């Protein structure tokens, strides 16, 4: 049997019932990678030797009926900005080429404790800055549904690997849509948890008030199973929330009769393609058919999400990325003749164009004379966006809309046009600014390219999000599409 497109849930049961060994699962996954990844280009590094060794250890435990761990023997791919002890972590940048961490991120510790098996590290936009995975220093990942299209970003490798059947689940990070947008483009399920739900310890920081780690899977229930394994308060991350209700699967099958869902008119407004609008309207009718009430509302400050987000995120990035100075670790320019030259040349040569663009933007926004006009004003707009959501959630359980304004664009089309690229974040950035949970699930296709439907929930109410997404998934089954790729 081939396990390449099996769900996490099915693999757990197959291993538990001794119908397959962890070694067989891992072996099949590496065979799939060998066959497909030269085309998809989703992995930056494979941890094959350690993965095979780990799987053999799990085989022995399986034989003794000692199968402890929620993800016993399940292979995983990890975005390359999440620290993995002993495995190269580059953030897809020349700046960190050859950097091998000597400690483990919290999420990796949790996944290893649940006996998941690390397959390798996944490609991304450099330092998570981009929406197409084209800013990676190493390679350009393609969309498994259409090899002329981008997979989205910044977690493009994480989404493409899952869609192509190269891992049953992956982790990504989402600062302004970097899990949900590639999930939408690649036709899979991607969740950005509530800010603070998952520890950021060991996530290479981009924008600390926005970053959040989350799972990418091919089914909603798989997504919930992975989130259960990685949530929880962490003493190493002061922003991780002391909320210990990590049971997202018990209510997942409950119907959604009587649930109140809000559809913001702005989410079907200017810039959203006709195909996306049509798919979302169909999805709304499906939700009504499931017994939910869907009503149109207004989130008037949506249009300010992108400018506010790019000022705040770039400002935080300019601060966070100042640690890459060519001295302690990372790229060290061999041509520098003084300390000042070492700083300038290491950073100029080590960072790519998009990263430098955002550092410049952030430094400018924080500079004397401009701070009030840009950074401070953006924080005020952020509060207005949060207030919009709070007002809606007084009367509604969930917000629904498209994940992205269009389907995946062609490789090369927008890489030299940053403003057009940034516009793709129209519907995802407000969720990060408000710190809310958001999930993208497939809801259609246009010319063979997937369309994503986004559900947005109240803070720490991932349970309801999963319930709605799961019920919708029962009526819109996308699972057969992956094996056709």
Swiss-Prot record:
InterPro entries: Amidase, Amidase_CS, Amidase_dom, AS_sf, GatA
Domain of life: Bacteria
Keyword annotations: ATP-binding, Ligase, Nucleotide-binding, Protein biosynthesis
GO MF entry, a single one: ATP binding
Residue numbers annotated as active site: 79, 154, 178
UniProt GO BP: translation
E.C. code: 6.3.5.7
Reactions that this protein is recorded to catalyse: L-glutamyl-tRNA(Gln) + L-glutamine + ATP + H2O = L-glutaminyl-tRNA(Gln) + L-glutamate + ADP + phosphate + H(+)
A GO cellular component annotation in the UniProt record: glutamyl-tRNA(Gln) amidotransferase complex
Quaternary structure annotation from Swiss-Prot or TrEMBL: Heterotrimer of A, B and C subunits.
Family: Belongs to the amidase family. GatA subfamily.
Described purpose of this protein according to its UniProt entry: Allows the formation of correctly charged Gln-tRNA(Gln) through the transamidation of misacylated Glu-tRNA(Gln) in organisms which lack glutaminyl-tRNA synthetase. The reaction takes place in the presence of glutamine and ATP through an activated gamma-phospho-Glu-tRNA(Gln).
Listed name of the protein: Glutamyl-tRNA(Gln) amidotransferase subunit A
């Amino acid at each position: 049997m081939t396990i390449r497109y099996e769900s996490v849930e099915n693999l757990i049961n197959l291993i538990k019932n001794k119908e397959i060994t962890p070694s067989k699962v891992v072996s099949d996954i590496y065979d799939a990678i060998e066959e497909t990844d030269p085309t998809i280009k989703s992995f930056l590094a494979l941890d094959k030797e350690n993965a095979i060794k780990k799987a053999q250890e799990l085989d022995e435990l399986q034989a003794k009926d000692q199968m402890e761990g929620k993800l016993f023997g399940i292979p995983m791919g990890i975005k390359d900005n999440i620290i993995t002890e002993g495995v190269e972590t580059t953030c897809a940048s020349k700046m960190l080429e050859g950097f091998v961490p000597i400690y483990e991120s919290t999420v990796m510790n949790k996944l290893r404790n649940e006996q998941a098996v690390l397959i390798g590290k996944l490609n991304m936009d450099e330092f998570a800055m981009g929406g197409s995975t084209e800013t990676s220093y190493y390679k350009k990942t393609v969309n498994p549904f259409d090899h002329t299209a981008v997979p989205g970003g910044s977690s493009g490798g994480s989404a493409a690997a899952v869609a192509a059947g190269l891992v049953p689940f992956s982790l990504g990070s989402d600062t302004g849509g970097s899990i949900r947008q590639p999930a939408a483009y690649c036709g899979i399920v991607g969740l950005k948890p509530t800010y603070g739900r998952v520890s950021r310890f060991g996530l290479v920081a981009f924008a600390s008030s926005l970053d959040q780690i989350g799972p990418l899977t091919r089914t909603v229930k798989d997504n919930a199973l992975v989130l259960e394994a990685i949530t929880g308060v962490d003493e190493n991350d002061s922003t991780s929330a002391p909320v210990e209700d990590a049971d997202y699967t018990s209510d997942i099958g409950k119907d959604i009769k009587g649930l109140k869902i809000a559809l913001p008119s702005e989410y079907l407004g200017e810039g959203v393609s006709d195909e996306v609008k049509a798919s979302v309207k169909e999805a709304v009718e499906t939700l009504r058919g499931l017994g939910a009430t869907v009503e149109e509302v207004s989130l008037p400050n949506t249009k300010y999400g992108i400018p506010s987000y790019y000022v705040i995120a770039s400002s935080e990035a300019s601060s966070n990325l100042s640690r890459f100075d060519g001295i302690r670790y990372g790229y060290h320019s061999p041509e520098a003749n003084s300390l000042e030259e070492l700083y300038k040349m290491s950073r100029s040569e080590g960072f790519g164009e998009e990263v430098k663009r955002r550092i410049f933007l952030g430094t400018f926004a924080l500079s004397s004379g401009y701070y009030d006009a840009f950074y401070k004003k953006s924080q005020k707009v952020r509060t207005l966006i949060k207030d919009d959501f709070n007002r809606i959630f007084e009367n509604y359980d969930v917000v629904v809309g498209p994940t992205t304004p269009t389907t995946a664009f062609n490789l090369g089309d927008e890489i030299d046009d940053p403003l057009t690229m940034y516009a793709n974040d129209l519907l995802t950035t407000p969720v990060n600014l408000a710190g809310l949970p958001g999930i993208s699930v497939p809801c259609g296709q246009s010319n063979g390219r997937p369309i994503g439907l986004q559900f947005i929930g109240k803070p720490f109410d991932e349970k309801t999000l999963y319930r709605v997404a799961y019920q919708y998934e029962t009526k819109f089954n996308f699972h057969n599409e992956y094996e056709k790729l």
